[in-house]
């Protein structure tokens, strides 16, 4: 589960991390409160969406102007102008689709005198089963680009779960970030604070980009991105309450109610598959033949007729879907159950796009018979390659 920057900063501040004063803005009526609360003379007006690259992003609406989703204001009137330009409009970044994300919230905070920008994140290292700090002197940049172009500028520090962040660990991080003086002293305090927040709140990732050294020599968390382990939310009702459902696709929210693994994408071919590996292979082969998947949808191994029908109807709610590929390998999942669910959903939705079904595994003959005798216009496929070619051909007309 992801949260907004302002929520992440409030959480980190509660653990003792140094963050700037700021005011969340949910409507234009909140802007004056921010102006009255924050002294200036520099304010930063930030779009709050669940996507990175906001500063370099562009708004779709012309009235939002040419600037990105993070803007500096040197007087109170500019604070108001930037807020009016951004709130309610759609921001496109490198991490959004071409349709962008609507900016429903802003965060207005005090500006900072920046001397140096650094990168710091905490994550679970799957290879070592430890929590690890990943740090770099190249802050404020796309860390993936740094990893690709100059991997030697990134250092990973493994943390012993029995000891936590030791003075030796903190010294390694300080050395990697070339910190000295007050900044190094701040680091000795900050790293254990961030680690404690990460562990106690069951975070999946904590990214501070940038972590800045200010001109007075002290550290500050300038931007923060936090995601949580969804499986642990039952232990943290305070964290679960931070969820902003407007940031999620409505189809994804409905899929979650059915315990379906569904992710909306930008293509035109809807996919319903059982098993994450098979789902990814299905999307890959669709791309291989020149089209794009409209979604990732894994119905799981033990889905019943109702769950299958629900998945099908969720896929159909995407207006970009021009065809659907059902690709099922029946192990625990039975092909006849899939067939019954698909038929029920097709009848309820009055399907008007091509449908290709590939079934293999448990009760496959019965499943094929059910589809064949349904009288519906379903295109059968013998294998995955055949299915992909048929749905691509059908979509292209």
Curated annotation (Swiss-Prot):
Binding of Mg(2+), residues: 209, 223
Q: What is its EC number?
A: 6.2.1.5
Q: Summarize where ATP binds, as residue positions.
A: 46, 53-55, 109, 112, 117
One GO term of the biological process aspect: succinyl-CoA metabolic process
List the record's Gene Ontology CC terms alphabetically. cytosol; succinate-CoA ligase complex
Q: Which residues form the ATP-grasp domain?
A: 9-254
Matching Pfam families: ATP-grasp_2 (PF08442), Ligase_CoA (PF00549)
MF terms in GO = ATP binding; magnesium ion binding; succinate-CoA ligase (ADP-forming) activity; succinate-CoA ligase (GDP-forming) activity
The cofactors named for this UniProt entry are: Mg(2+)
Q: Which InterPro entries match?
A: ATP-grasp, ATP-grasp_succ-CoA_synth-type, ATP_grasp_subdomain_1, Succ-CoA_synthase_bsu_CS, SUCC_ACL_C, Succ_CoA_ligase-like_bsu, Succinyl-CoA_synth-like
Give the record's cofactor note, including how many are bound: Binds 1 Mg(2+) ion per subunit.
Tell me the route in metabolism or biology where this protein functions. Carbohydrate metabolism; tricarboxylic acid cycle; succinate from succinyl-CoA (ligase route): step 1/1
EC top class, as a word: ligase
Reactions mediated catalytically: succinate + ATP + CoA = succinyl-CoA + ADP + phosphate; GTP + succinate + CoA = succinyl-CoA + GDP + phosphate
What are the protein's UniProt keywords? Answer: ATP-binding, Ligase, Magnesium, Metal-binding, Nucleotide-binding, Tricarboxylic acid cycle
The positions annotated for binding substrate are 274, 331-333
Endpoints of the signal sequence? none
Q: Which family does it belong to?
A: Belongs to the succinate/malate CoA ligase beta subunit family.
Subunit description: Heterotetramer of two alpha and two beta subunits.
What is the role of this chain?
Succinyl-CoA synthetase functions in the citric acid cycle (TCA), coupling the hydrolysis of succinyl-CoA to the synthesis of either ATP or GTP and thus represents the only step of substrate-level phosphorylation in the TCA. The beta subunit provides nucleotide specificity of the enzyme and binds the substrate succinate, while the binding sites for coenzyme A and phosphate are found in the alpha subunit.
What is the protein named? Succinate--CoA ligase [ADP-forming] subunit beta
Native organism: Hyphomonas neptunium (strain ATCC 15444)
């Amino acid at each position: 589960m992801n949260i907004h920057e302002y929520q992440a900063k409030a959480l980190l501040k509660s653990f003792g991390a140094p963050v700037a004063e700021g005011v969340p803005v949910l409507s234009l009526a909140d802007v004056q409160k921010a102006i009255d609360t924050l002294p200036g003379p520099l304010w930063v007006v930030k779009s709050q969406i669940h996507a990175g690259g906001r500063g370099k992003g562009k708004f779709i609406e012309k009235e939002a102007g040419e600037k990105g989703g993070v803007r500096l204001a040197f007087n109170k009137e500019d604070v108001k102008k930037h807020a009016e330009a951004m709130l309610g409009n759609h921001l496109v970044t490198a991490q959004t689709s071409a349709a962008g994300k609507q900016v429903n919230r802003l965060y207005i905070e005090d500006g900072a005198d920046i001397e140096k920008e650094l990168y710091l994140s905490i994550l679970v290292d799957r290879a070592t089963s430890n929590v690890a700090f990943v740090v770099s002197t190249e802050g404020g940049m796309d860390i993936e680009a740094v990893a690709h172009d100059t991997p030697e500028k990134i250092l990973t520090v493994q943390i012993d779960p029995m000891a936590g962040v030791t003075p030796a660990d903190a010294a390694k991080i300080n050395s990697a970030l070339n910190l000295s003086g007050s900044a190094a002293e701040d680091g000795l305090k900050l790293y254990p604070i961030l680690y404690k927040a990460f562990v106690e709140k069951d975070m999946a990732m904590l990214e501070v980009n940038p972590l800045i050294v200010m001109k007075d020599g002290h550290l500050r968390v300038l931007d923060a991105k936090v995601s949580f382990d969804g499986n642990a939310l039952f232990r943290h009702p305070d964290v679960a309450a931070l969820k902003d459902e407007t940031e999620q696709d409505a189809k994804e929210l409905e899929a979650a109610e059915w315990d379906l693994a569904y992710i909306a994408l930008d293509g035109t071919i809807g996919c319903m598959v059982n098993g994450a590996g098979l789902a990814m292979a299905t999307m890959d082969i669709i791309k291989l033949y020149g089209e794009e998947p409209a979604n990732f949808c894994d119905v799981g191994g033990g889905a019943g007729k109702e769950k299958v029908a629900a998945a099908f109807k969720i896929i159909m709610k995407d207006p970009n879907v021009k065809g659907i590929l059902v690709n099922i390998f029946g192990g625990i999942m039975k092909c006849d159950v899939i067939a019954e669910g698909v038929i029920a959903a097709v009848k309820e939705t009055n399907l008007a796009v091509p449908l290709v079904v590939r079934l293999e595994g448990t009760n496959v003959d019965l499943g094929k018979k059910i589809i064949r005798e349904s009288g519906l216009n379903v295109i059968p496929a013998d294998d995955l390659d055949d299915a992909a070619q048929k749905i691509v051909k059908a979509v292209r007309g």
